[in-house]
């Protein structure tokens, strides 16, 4: 159902996205922007909708974005606050917002060109927002169509094959450090990035893999330990941190012991980082900044024809949305 006031999109109220990505920012800056956007969510209250909130927050390893139907002044205010960090955020409105999310969902705006993980991340961000709020029709329409067309784009072979990925980087790093394939590996968090790395390493012959999550996962074929039973004194040779807000999920006393095993390696995939930078041993630790640098060196350039193809699809959906809103406006005027 189209909500009253949505016919104003493109005038005083905009459908827009503001954010930063790996292109403009370091990991630390993305963490700071994430904090700003989290604090600002309560400000996205377009009076014309008479709703408390109307936004979708997309936070991944390489991007932090907030999508909303809101007055332009709110986007401007956020942009000014982010600029105080020394960062220039991008802001796309209306049809350009459509084009941006379609390219994001299709893997064409990713550091790992053509990656599939972003599709799931976009879907989870949308579903979480839909559970917590009464989203506007425009946001439902935007995310549903972007997810649909991202999937279609991949199925047709439009998305390039991601030959250089985070699992491949991890595999190469373990080989460089001569980590034995019988070594014990611990994955904290059942995130998609942790799963992709774990299954890749198992295919490469690593056999002692343990997952730690909030609760037992009945379908998981690997060893498991619940968080309450986690102990860093156990001889885990490599630890992978891949859960959101992980820094606060475990007691401080437990984190203090993560370096007690000599030569233990830690991969921190979390954003914000699970381990503050001043607490780590640099030669035994990799965060998303270091991983991003490696990926950037090996990144393929996006095919402009692929970009144009997805953008054209996005523009058609934007026009379709406007036609629906105009029809609703006409019906309301004649009622």
Curated annotation (Swiss-Prot):
Pathway in which this enzyme or protein is active: Porphyrin-containing compound metabolism; protoporphyrin-IX biosynthesis; 5-aminolevulinate from L-glutamyl-tRNA(Glu): step 1/2
Note: During catalysis, the active site Cys acts as a nucleophile attacking the alpha-carbonyl group of tRNA-bound glutamate with the formation of a thioester intermediate between enzyme and glutamate, and the concomitant release of tRNA(Glu). The thioester intermediate is finally reduced by direct hydride transfer from NADPH, to form the product GSA.
Residues flagged as site, Important for activity: 100
Organism of provenance: Chlamydia trachomatis serovar L2 (strain ATCC VR-902B / DSM 19102 / 434/Bu)
Description of its domains: Possesses an unusual extended V-shaped dimeric structure with each monomer consisting of three distinct domains arranged along a curved 'spinal' alpha-helix. The N-terminal catalytic domain specifically recognizes the glutamate moiety of the substrate. The second domain is the NADPH-binding domain, and the third C-terminal domain is responsible for dimerization.
Tree of life domain: Bacteria
Protein name as catalogued: Glutamyl-tRNA reductase
Catalytic residues of the enzyme: 61
Oligomeric form and interacting partners: Homodimer.
GO molecular function: glutamyl-tRNA reductase activity; NADP binding
Record Pfam families: GlutR_N
PROSITE patterns recorded: GLUTR (PS00747)
Annotated EC: 1.2.1.70
Gene3D superfamilies: Glutamyl-tRNA reductase, N-terminal domain (3.30.460.30)
Similarity comment: family membership: Belongs to the glutamyl-tRNA reductase family.
Protein function: Catalyzes the NADPH-dependent reduction of glutamyl-tRNA(Glu) to glutamate 1-semialdehyde (GSA).
InterPro entries found in the cross-reference section: 4pyrrol_synth_GluRdtase (IPR000343), 4pyrrol_synth_GluRdtase_N (IPR015895), GluRdtase_CS (IPR018214), GluRdtase_N_sf (IPR036343)
HAMAP family: Glu_tRNA_reductase
Statement: the UniProt record of this protein carries the keyword NADP: yes
Binding site for NADP(+): 189-194
GO biological process: protoporphyrinogen IX biosynthetic process
Record-listed substrate binding positions: 60-63, 110, 115-117, 121
Enzyme class: oxidoreductase
Chemical reaction(s) catalysed: (S)-4-amino-5-oxopentanoate + tRNA(Glu) + NADP(+) = L-glutamyl-tRNA(Glu) + NADPH + H(+)
């Amino acid at each position: 159902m189209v909500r009253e006031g949505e016919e104003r999109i493109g005038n005083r109220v905009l459908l827009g996205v503001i954010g930063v990505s790996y292109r403009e920012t370091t990991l630390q800056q993305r963490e700071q922007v994430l904090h700003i956007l989290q604090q600002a969510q309560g400000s996205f209250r377009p009076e014309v909708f008479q709703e408390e909130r109307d936004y979708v927050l997309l936070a991944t390893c390489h991007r932090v974005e907030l999508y909303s139907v809101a007055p332009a002044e709110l986007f401007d205010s956020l942009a000014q606050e982010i600029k105080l960090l020394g960062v220039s955020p991008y802001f796309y409105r209306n049809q350009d917002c459509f084009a941006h999310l379609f390219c994001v969902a299709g893997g064409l705006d990713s550091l790992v060109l053509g990656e599939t993980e972003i599709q799931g991340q976009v879907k989870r961000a949308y579903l979480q927002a839909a559970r917590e709020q009464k989203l506007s029709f425009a946001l439902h329409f935007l995310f549903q169509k972007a997810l649909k067309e991202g999937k279609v784009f991949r199925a047709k072979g439009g998305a390039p094959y991601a030959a250089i990925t985070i699992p491949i980087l991890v595999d190469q790093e373990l080989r460089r450090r001569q980590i034995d394939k019988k070594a014990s590996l611990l994955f904290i968090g059942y995130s998609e990035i942790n799963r992709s790395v774990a299954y890749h390493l198992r295919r490469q012959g690593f056999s002692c893999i343990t997952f730690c999550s909030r609760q037992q996962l009945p379908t998981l074929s690997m060893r498991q330990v619940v968080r309450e039973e986690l102990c860093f004194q156990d001889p885990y040779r490599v630890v992978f941190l891949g859960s959101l807000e992980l820094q606060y999920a475990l007691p401080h006393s437990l984190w203090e012991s993560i370096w007690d095993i000599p030569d233990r390696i830690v991969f921190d995939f979390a954003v914000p980082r699970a381990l503050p930078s001043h607490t780590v041993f640099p030669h035994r630790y990799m965060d998303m900044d270091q991983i991003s640098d490696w990926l950037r060196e090996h990144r393929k350039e996006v095919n402009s024809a692929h970009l144009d193809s997805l953008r054209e699809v996005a523009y058609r959906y934007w026009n379709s949305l406007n036609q629906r809103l105009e029809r609703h406006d006409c019906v309301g005027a004649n009622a």
